[in-house]
């Protein structure tokens, strides 16, 4: 895995965790592991000077 791929994966994980914390979609205690619902797909837009990048999180 290259540097770019690892950074994209870290960004997706951070955004997913923030969405789960904000919407309380994780299961179990707040200090436990985060499990997302099976059919949940979140779409987050990240703006850049070159254009918009859509991150599909699932």
Curated annotation (Swiss-Prot):
<protein>
    <recommendedName>
        <fullName>Uncharacterized protein ORF58</fullName>
    </recommendedName>
</protein>
